[in-house]
């Protein structure tokens, strides 16, 4: 039986929450613990990187700061949620040249301070902003620094809306970006559709539906940790690291570049034996190389 603990690429469908998606995955895999790479609104679809079991701790290590999206938006009206699922609260009748909207994208490249939507999961004094907003409680959200590294907008006359492709930092609210693009052109904007297409090097084309997930569909740890330098150690060394002992780096110093970054440690293939399950040797954990020693930092005892 394949151990279900691991990293999975999931294509979230529309109409369910991100936590609802996790519930399906936990049921399908028969596990109790799972986490994901960042919330997608119920109306949104696309890539979620899901970690299960003991590997939920890996999420902060494998999720890069850049996420990519595609979607559509309309102008001339705004909802209370800034997307099509909310109630229309404002309209403007003035016509706007589509070319003005298309050219506005360039002004949003780079760093900027973004005001999140009030209907969001941000906590305000211990309560979710969306709960406060729905209870008609007055509150203000702080702006947050975001980075947009790529952004293109194109008018779709057959649908009378605008399509976009976007790469941005984690924590960017696409609904707010659409709002701000519209404001910059003296109109209003509302998100119609949103699909997350990439998280770092992970692509939605590799993902599976939550209902289709099985333990053999988890990605290899070498793929999950492709941004890390890596070394392979014997079972004896792995056991010492699990005990929190520093290990002389010895010949391993020639296998990694000098750096203060953490190094991923795997069990040697011959030591892993039958536990491979067709995947890479098991992850032992992370170390730093300091003054010729391997210092354990975050370890993952073998199942």
Name what the model sees in each region:
Residues 1-13, 19-36, 40, 44-47, ...:
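Accessory RNA 3′-end/elbow-binding domains used by RNA modification enzymes
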Residues 1-176, 180-205, 286:
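RNA pseudouridine synthases
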């Amino acid at each position: 039986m394949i151990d279900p603990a691991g990293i999975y690429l999931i294509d979230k469908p529309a109409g369910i929450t991100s936590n609802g998606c996790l519930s399906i995955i936990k049921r399908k895999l028969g596990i109790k613990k799972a986490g994901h790479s960042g919330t997608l609104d119920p109306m949104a679809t696309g890539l979620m990187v899901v970690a299960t079991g003991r590997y939920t701790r890996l999420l902060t290590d494998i999720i890069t700061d850049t996420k990519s999206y595609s979607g559509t938006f309309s102008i001339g009206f705004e909802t209370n949620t800034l997307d099509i699922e909310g109630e229309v609260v404002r309209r403007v009748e003035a016509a706007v040249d589509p070319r003005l909207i298309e050219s506005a994208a360039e002004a949003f490249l780079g760093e900027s301070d973004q005001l999140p939507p009030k209907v969001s999961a941000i906590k305000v004094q211990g309560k979710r902003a969306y709960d406060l907003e729905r209870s008609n409680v007055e509150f203000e959200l702080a702006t947050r620094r975001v980075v947009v590294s790529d952004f293109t907008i194109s008018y779709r006359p057959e649908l009378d809306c605008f399509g976009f492709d976007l790469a941005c930092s984690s924590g960017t609210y696409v609904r707010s970006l659409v709002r701000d693009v519209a404001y910059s052109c003296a109109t209003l904007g509302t998100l119609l559709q949103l699909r997350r297409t990439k998280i770092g090097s992970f692509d939605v084309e590799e993902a599976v539906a939550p209902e289709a997930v099985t333990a053999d569909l988890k990605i290899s740890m070498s793929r999950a940790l492709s941004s890390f330098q890596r070394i392979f150690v014997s079972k004896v060394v792995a056991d010492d690291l699990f005990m929190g002992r520093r290990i002389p780096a010895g010949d391993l110093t020639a296998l990694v570049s000098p750096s203060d970054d953490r190094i991923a440690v795997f069990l040697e293939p011959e030591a892993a034996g039958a536990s491979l399950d067709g995947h890479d040797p098991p992850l032992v954990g992370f170390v730093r190389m300091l003054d010729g020693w391997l210092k354990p930092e975050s370890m993952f005892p073998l199942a």
